[in-house]
């Protein structure tokens, strides 16, 4: 097996695989330079693979002769991709006797694309899940072999739902390998008529719009929390809302209705419970207000 992945989300799957199977090599995105002091940061999967003593490859572009040759000559039967962050070149997909499987965080054909976890929360879905699918040249359109649904509760945010899904993915990939070893693999085509697309999160989506129903606003805050987050401006400073809930109070859109940060929106209001100033730690409202002044009657933009 060859494994391809990059973020925290991919770690449970790699751990599960390496505990039961031989992982020949791990591919991940190349280390990034952090602006402060130009420190080089390896991806979470890079660090995990080193702990597991699995060789790591991190080409800037997967599409090159060396990587093609390496994968072709590795004699791997399977390449498992979990949030790698690069498109698999078609010539790789055409290597004989090698199957590329992708672990996608939605119940395909719903939420194909880059941000399925965020979009499912933002659209107030009640459930999402994991799909294990065959990779084909057109993104997220390949036939799937397994799916498992995961319920989304009202308190779930991007972080908590990602954690749930990553653990389900790890178990499901082991089940998929059992089927693969027994040669009982059956792929089902996706129904194109049901396909929806989870577009990449745009920076603009992080700006708050108080002219939004409270329920929809909470869904957006949860979907983008903790990163990139939804922020408002107060006295020129950007403040990120990490957690909030619906309040039945009424007020003008963007107006601070009470001293414990209940803010008016299109229909009702939201009460902010956790927030964060740029570059600072996340604080509960009470602690935040002890060091930063926002008072009843202020307008937040």
Q: Which role fits each region the language model picked out?
A:
Residues 1-37:
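N-terminal Rossmann-like dinucleotide-binding module
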Residues 199-212:
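Acyl-group handling in specialized metabolite and lipid biosynthesis
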Residues 6-9, 60-63, 84-86, 224, ...:
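Short beta->alpha connector loops
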Residues 33-77:
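N-terminal glycine-/serine-/threonine-rich beta1-alpha1-beta2 phosphate-ribose binding loop
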Residues 24-25, 55-74, 87-105:
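Internal alpha/beta domain cores that form substrate/cofactor-binding pockets in large enzymes
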Residues 211-301:
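An anion-binding loop in the catalytic cleft
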Residues 18-19, 29, 78-197, 204:
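Donor/substrate-binding cores of folate-linked one-carbon enzymes
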């Amino acid at each position: 097996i060859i494994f391809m992945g990059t973020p925290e989300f991919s770690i449970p799957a790699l751990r599960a695989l390496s505990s039961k199977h031989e992982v020949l090599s791990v591919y991940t995105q190349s280390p990034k330079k952090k602006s402060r002091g130009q420190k080089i940061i390896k991806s979470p999967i890079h660090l995990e693979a080193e702990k597991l003593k699995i060789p790591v490859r991190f080409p800037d572009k997967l599409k090159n002769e060396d990587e093609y040759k390496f994968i072709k000559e590795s004699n791997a039967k399977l390449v498992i991709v979990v949030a790698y962050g690069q498109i698999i070149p078609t010539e790789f997909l055409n290597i004989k006797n090698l199957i590329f499987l992708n672990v996608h965080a939605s119940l395909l054909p719903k939420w194909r694309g880059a941000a399925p976890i965020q979009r499912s929360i933002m659209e107030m879905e009640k459930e999402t899940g994991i799909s294990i699918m065959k990779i084909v040249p057109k993104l997220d359109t390949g036939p799937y072999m397994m799916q498992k649904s995961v319920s989304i509760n009202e308190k779930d945010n991007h972080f908590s739902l990602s954690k749930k899904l990553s653990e389900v993915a790890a178990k499901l990939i082991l089940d998929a390998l059992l089927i693969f070893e027994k040669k009982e693999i059956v792929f089902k085509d996706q129904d194109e008529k049901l396909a929806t697309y989870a577009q990449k999160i745009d920076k603009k989506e992080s700006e708050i719009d108080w002219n939004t129903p409270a329920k929809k606003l909470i869904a957006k805050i949860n979907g983008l929390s903790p990163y990139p987050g939804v922020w408002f401006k107060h006295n020129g400073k950007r403040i990120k809302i990490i957690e909030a809930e619906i309040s039945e109070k009424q007020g003008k859109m963007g107006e601070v209705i009470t001293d414990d940060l209940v803010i008016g929106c299109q229909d009702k209001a939201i009460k902010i419970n956790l927030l964060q100033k740029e570059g600072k730690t996340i604080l509960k409202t009470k602690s935040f207000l002890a060091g930063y002044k926002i008072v009843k009657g202020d307008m937040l933009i």
